[in-house]
């Protein structure tokens, strides 16, 4: 019989060993949630493009109306130990680049939204004051080489958002998405 402690260790191991799959699943959930919410708000001019690989620092290009966002997504367990993430400096060159750090439960439910970015049309906040990231594996001499294009962002560099509506507001400057939904729900029970 499995104890609670064993179950937690097993879940954490599953998350660690399948992190790429986990990130793909959460990316699909996040995109679906954003598109569904925009649909509920009557906003239908939406496009989502996926990068084949992360050379330019973004995972998604999200367009809504005339706002285009290059988004790098990060995912971690809400009660996990992850205190920082690496950001590709190329993201600063992308139009309206931003990073969204999603906190998920063991069942991949998104419960936390963190934001690092600026208003649409503006560049990322300056990354020069942040430490340079290092490779996870050391070379033959035991040295972990620097990753010149990567900077470390601690959790404190991110703004914790109230939820999906505030995230959509940051991405696309759609004000008071939450209030619009309440009005819609009241008119259309």
Predicted regions and their residues:
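Mixed-charge (Asp/Glu-Lys/Arg
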Residues: 1-56, 61-189
């Amino acid at each position: 019989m499995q104890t609670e402690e064993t179950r937690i260790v097993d879940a954490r191991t599953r998350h660690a060993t399948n992190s790429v799959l986990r990130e793909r699943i959460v990316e699909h959930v996040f995109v679906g949630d954003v598109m569904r919410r925009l649909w509920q708000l009557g906003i239908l001019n939406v496009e989502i493009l996926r990068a084949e690989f992360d050379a330019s620092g973004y995972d998604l290009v999200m367009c809504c109306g005339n706002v285009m966002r290059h988004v790098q997504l990060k995912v971690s367990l809400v009660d996990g130990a992850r205190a920082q993430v690496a950001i590709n400096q190329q993201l600063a060159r992308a139009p309206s680049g931003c990073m969204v750090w999603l906190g998920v439960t063991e069942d991949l439910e998104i419960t936390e939204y963190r934001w690092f970015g600026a208003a649409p049309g503006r560049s990322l906040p300056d990354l020069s004051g942040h430490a340079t990231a290092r490779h996870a594996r050391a070379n033959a001499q035991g040295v972990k080489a620097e990753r010149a294009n990567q900077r470390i962002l601690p959790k404190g560099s991110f703004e914790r958002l109230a939820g999906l509506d505030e995230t959509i507001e940051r991405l696309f400057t759609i004000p008071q998405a939450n209030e619009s939904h309440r009005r819609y729900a009241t008119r259309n029970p």
